[in-house]
């Protein structure tokens, strides 16, 4: 019997099985399909959610993070196919991306998770600067707060704004005031221009 080989994943830096890599590539394919040509705002989270249904670009239903984000943006899912909903998100010039493109393994402690984020940050910033090229970055994960000094305007090559959204921490739910602040941040960013 062959011993499974674990290799570092390009998307998150964690040691990964073939299934992990296949799942990352599937999610990358889903996200690429709805990537706008000109990205007005990149919504940056710490890591991808565990469940595919929580992953915004999944063809499944929009639950968890995906549902909360769409609600915060005022994008209705009622009576629409996932393609119609994602096309609306795309038309707004928005992209949701994660510093770690894969979920953090469940047995990873907080210090290990932070080390993963710090280690993968240069690669993620290079991707933002060279490939995505957004007009602005909106950091929405509270877990990225300790990396704020590394996420300055010069690192991604565009203005960086912080409006933490608790839904991107699996153990918290966003409250009404947080949703209102998040909704208010997007038009303000658009008015800033670059």
Regions found by a protein language model. Give the residues of each.
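Short, flexible loop segments at boundaries between secondary-structure elements
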Residues: 71-78, 156-190
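Extended, charge-rich low-complexity interaction segments
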Residues: 128, 190-194
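A polyanion-binding, active-site-adjacent surface
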Residues: 1-154, 158-162
């Amino acid at each position: 019997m062959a011993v499974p080989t674990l290799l570092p994943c390009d998307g998150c830096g964690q040691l990964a099985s073939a299934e992990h890599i296949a799942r990352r590539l599937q999610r990358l394919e889903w996200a690429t399909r709805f990537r706008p040509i000109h990205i007005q705002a990149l919504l940056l989270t710490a890591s991808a959610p565990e469940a595919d249904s929580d992953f915004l670009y999944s063809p499944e239903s929009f639950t968890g993070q995906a549902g909360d984000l769409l609600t915060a943006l005022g994008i209705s899912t009622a009576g629409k196919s996932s393609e119609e909903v994602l096309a609306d998100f795309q038309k707004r010039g928005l992209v949701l991306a994660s510093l770690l493109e894969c979920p953090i393994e469940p047995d990873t402690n907080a210090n290990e998770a932070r080390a993963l984020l710090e280690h993968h940050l240069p690669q993620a910033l290079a991707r933002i600067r060279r490939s995505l090229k957004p007009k602005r970055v909106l950091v929405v994960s509270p877990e990225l707060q300790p990396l704020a000094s590394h996420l300055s305007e010069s690192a991604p090559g565009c203005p960086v704004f912080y409006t933490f959204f608790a839904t991107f921490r699996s153990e918290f739910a966003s409250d009404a005031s947080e949703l209102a602040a998040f909704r208010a941040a997007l038009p303000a960013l658009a008015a800033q221009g670059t």
